[in-house]
Amino acid sequence: MKIIHIANFYGPKSGGIKTTLHNLGSGYTNRGHDFTYIVPGVGFYQEKTPHGNRITVPSWLIPFSGGYRIIRSNRQIKSILLALSPDRIEISDRFTLSGVGRWARSHKIPTLVFSHETLRGLIKTYQPFSLSKFVRWHNARLAASFDHVVTTTNFAAAEFREIGIDNLMQIPLGVDLATFSPKNRDEELRTKLLKNGDVLRVHCGRLSPEKKPERSIEALRE
């Protein structure tokens, strides 16, 4: 099967989106599928990667975002899709790429969209007020544009369940049990990091507003 995944906000400094794409690609290719992912960049080029074929297309740099980019032309994306004739299309973006879902439906190509976050949470990060009606309208429109909406947590799924959509799929994230295992506990490293303290707390995450890294400190204070 030929699968194409299109994503915004993919780049050298991105975390979750890049990890998702690379793991999806590795999983698909290991099972014999042809996987291509289309991502934003500074120009147009194509390359082979361990995770599949990567096509980079021209994009806009989002000001004050720390380097995030969004794909510039949906028309170019549709031309690429016509040339590659995918069996399935996946999208990781809830804003500028929903039109690709409607286009794919007109070409009888099955689709899904990943909702990696909550729109309500994104708005609260950058705006001091609630836009509940907009959130409900946007999520209903997004769900209607694709055959399936995929979330990984109850938290991300909640705002879709609130509006009663019938094409929601919740697929929990997997865990790399070889890497994240008690067998890897290192008492020497723990002692070194504690520096004669009583509690060692490790925060693994990007220092960006939407990740709310301050919560680790707040939880410890409580």
Descriptions of predicted regions:
Residues 88-120:
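An aromatic- and histidine-rich active-site surface loop
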Residues 106, 132-148, 163:
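Membrane-proximal helix-turn-helix segments that form the acceptor-binding/catalytic region
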Residues 41, 155, 174:
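Carbohydrate-associated surface elements
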Residues 4, 194-221:
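Conserved donor-binding/catalytic core segment of Leloir-type glycosyltransferases
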Residues 1-56, 221:
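N-terminal subdomain of nucleotide-sugar transferases
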Residues 172-181:
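Short beta-strand->alpha-helix junction loop in the catalytic core
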Residues 52-79, 127, 131:
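A short, charged, and often flexible helix/loop element on the N-terminal side
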Residues 181-195:
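A short helix/loop element that forms part of the nucleotide-sugar donor recognition site in Leloir-type
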